[in-house]
A protein has these predicted regions:
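A short alpha-helical cap/connector motif
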Residues: 1-194, 198-222, 227-274
């Protein structure tokens, strides 16, 4: 029934009006009920720090205390632009709000890999209704002094807007990653790096290997949508390689509870030492 109503509205409304109606319905069905319920329901992520037994103090404590059931302003902003970071299947925005909430007025440099291609022929696409650049526009709105950069393998969706610039990158190609980081705009390093590209272990580690050195002191590197069946592989990689290779960084693997998604609603969050 809901699908039929959506299709009828899509046919009769302009794209912008249809987007506004969908956002209003989302607020009524998801945001407001969850906002009320979050006063009574507390759901926190399972957080594993690396190396095993390492206590990273306030960083891990902060992550373990986030109520991922509670919607936030970031949830609304990202959803308004068409991002899936906080609209049901993923609920990362509560965690990001806790991590970045005090940085609202800072002149941040942010890079997100994966613009959200709607090219159905490419792996990890967002479907025909996907909105490329949705998350980038969300970051721009949330941080009014930030410069936001994006990268994607789909050259057809690259774009440039006010405080947003995007580049080509194939995250399985080490040369392409080096070429990305050779761009003049990216020479100062990043305060926040998000990998929301090709969601495979090999792709994630490939981009991480070529990008972590470009994270500024105190910066945060995030890998989204880690699949549940790769958690143990990540445990081993973090314990035996990355935590030793980067001893001044804090590593936290988060399994984020979500009744709508029990397969890939997991994050790796890395904080660079000062």
């Amino acid at each position: 029934m809901i699908a039929k109503v959506r299709e009828l509205l899509r046919q009769r409304l302009s794209p912008l009006a249809f987007q506004d109606v969908c956002f209003y319905l989302w607020n009524c069905r998801f945001y407001l009920p969850r906002l009320i319920a979050s006063a009574f329901v507390q759901r926190t992520p399972i957080v594993q720090g690396f190396p095993h037994g390492h206590i990273a103090g306030p960083f891990l404590h902060q992550l373990r205390g986030v109520n991922v059931f509670a919607p936030t302003k970031m949830c609304r902003v990202m959803t308004r632009h068409g991002s899936d970071k906080g609209r049901g299947i993923h609920n990362y925005t509560a965690i990001y709000s806790a991590l970045f909430g005090t940085l609202h007025d800072q002149p941040l440099l942010i890079l997100e890999l994966g613009l959200g291609t709607n090219n159905m022929n490419l792996t990890s696409n967002m479907g025909a209704e996907g909105k490329p650049g949705a998350s980038l526009r969300g970051w721009r709105d949330l941080f009014p002094r930030a410069l936001v950069y994006g990268a994607d393998i789909d050259r057809g969706i690259l774009f440039e807007e006010d405080r947003i610039k995007t580049f080509y990158c194939d995250q399985l190609d080490s040369l392409a990653i080096r070429n990305l980081w050779s761009q003049p705009d990216l020479q100062s390093g990043m305060d926040i790096i998000i990998d929301d590209g090709l969601h495979t272990f090999d792709a994630n580690t490939s981009f991480l290997d070529g990008s972590l050195e470009h994270l500024r002191p105190g910066g945060v590197y995030i890998i989204e949508d880690i699949h549940q069946n790769t958690i143990e592989r990540w445990h081993n990689q973090l314990e035996t390689i990355y935590s030793k290779q980067f001893p001044n960084h804090d590593f936290a693997l988060l399994e984020v509870p979500n009744s709508s998604n029990q397969s890939d609603n997991n994050l790796l969050i890395i904080r660079s030492g000062a």
